[in-house]
Swiss-Prot record:
Biological role stated in the UniProt entry: Involved in gametogenesis and steroidogenesis.
GO cellular component, one term: extracellular space
Family designation: Belongs to the glycoprotein hormones subunit beta family.
Gene3D superfamilies listed in its UniProt record: Cystine-knot cytokines (2.10.90.10)
Protein name listed in UniProt: Gonadotropin subunit beta-1
Gene Ontology molecular function terms on file: follicle-stimulating hormone activity; follicle-stimulating hormone receptor binding
InterPro entries: Cystine-knot_cytokine, Glyco_hormone_CN, Gonadotropin_bsu, Gonadotropin_bsu_CS
Record keyword Glycoprotein present: yes
Top-level division of the source organism's lineage: Eukaryota
Signal peptide span: 1-17
Keyword Transmembrane: no
Location(s), subcellular: Secreted
Subunit-level organization: Heterodimer of an alpha and a beta chain.
Amino acid sequence: MMRGVTMVLLLPMLVWAGSECKARCCLTNISITVESDECGSCITVNTTACTGLCRTQERAYRSPVAPYFQNTCNFRDWTYETIQLPGCPLGVDSSFTYPVALSCECSQCNTEITDCGAFSMQPSSCHTHAYY
């Protein structure tokens, strides 16, 4: 009986150990749904982003003098790629540019280049999909 319990407890650890990211801040593949009313199209673009956990500590006492911040998993290096949306009439800009993460780091969220608000866990979607 003890052997069966041990295997049940070890299985989640093996699955966790086999994951590439292991919960640390790293690159991951994501899909972005892009919908254009002008072009009448909805496509899904595959790219990379940063995801995972960063070491942080919660202070027992927050001093008004000492700055308080927590590190989050952010892009370190990135580039942009541009695609042409299908179905656009003449005169409509069909280009869509999106970020592609090249590397990640644990750092303070830079509000000048990043939306540091809460992330929606609901998947984005539209009526028809095309994958690029």
